Amino acid sequence: GVREDTYPDVVXTA
């Protein structure tokens, strides 16, 4: 949700 560690919801934030 926030960074690449929780990416599955934002997938691309890194």
Curated annotation (Swiss-Prot):
GO terms for cellular component: extracellular region. It comes from the Eukaryota. The keyword Secreted applies. It is found in: Secreted, Cell wall. Keywords: Cell wall, Secreted. This is 43 kDa cell wall protein. It comes from Daucus carota (Wild carrot).
